Amino acid sequence: QESRSKAAREKLLRATIELLAERGYAGLTTKEVAARAGFSNGALMHHFSTKADLVIAAGAHIYERHIEEGRRIAASPAARTDPLKAFIADCENVYLGSSFIPTTEMMVAARSDPLMHAPFDAFMRDYRSTMNDIWMKAFMRAGYSEEQASFTIMSTLYIVRGMAINSLWQKNLPYYRSFLREWSKIEKTGALKKARATIR
């Protein structure tokens, strides 16, 4: 029974994420999510009583997966030899991958919805704090000082986030990747060695 319930939740969350990408938050209905997942609307309500509950759970699901994947990348042998390249790969997955549009839809909705704002803010803060900790350790394990690691993480994040916003209307992954390769080359010259930033 428990495994069936978990499988049903997974299907409903997956359908929610797909429909957020296709129709946006405003166009999302619990009825359509239930149909996409192969359930009745009543069955959906057994797991999620409101649209807000469903979307919050879908957001948490996405970021839990991002933490798992980020942890795997940060622990890989590649991250020990080139942590920046590994970190860029993780950032691409989060900000330039298929989950970015659904999570952006969630963020915009949560910004002004009092029922969604607090829980969404909580798991977003947990995600960022967890990933900062994981990647700080990965960079420092590869020989970066704490100051270097902080600056490299934050500056790379801001670059990729800007690309992510641009990608909402102008998709150009090859260009973004070429730009990130150049950024990586600049960082590796040591020209930014004395730069400082607070990890956030």
What are these regions (language model features)?
Residues 8-11, 15-53, 57:
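Helix-turn-helix
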Residues 57-60, 68-98, 152-156, 198:
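Hydrophobic alpha-helical connector segments
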Residues 49-53, 57, 75-78, 111, ...:
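Residues in soluble alpha-helical coiled-coils and helical-bundle/repeat scaffolds
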Residues 11, 15-22, 69-73, 102, ...:
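Solvent-exposed, amphipathic alpha-helical segments
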Residues 115-121, 138-200:
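Hydrophobic/aromatic-rich alpha-helical bundle segments in the mid-to-C-terminal region
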Residues 67-68, 72, 93-104, 114-140, ...:
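Amphipathic alpha-helical packing segments from all-alpha helical-bundle domains
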Residues 2-3, 7, 49, 53, ...:
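Residues at secondary-structure transition points
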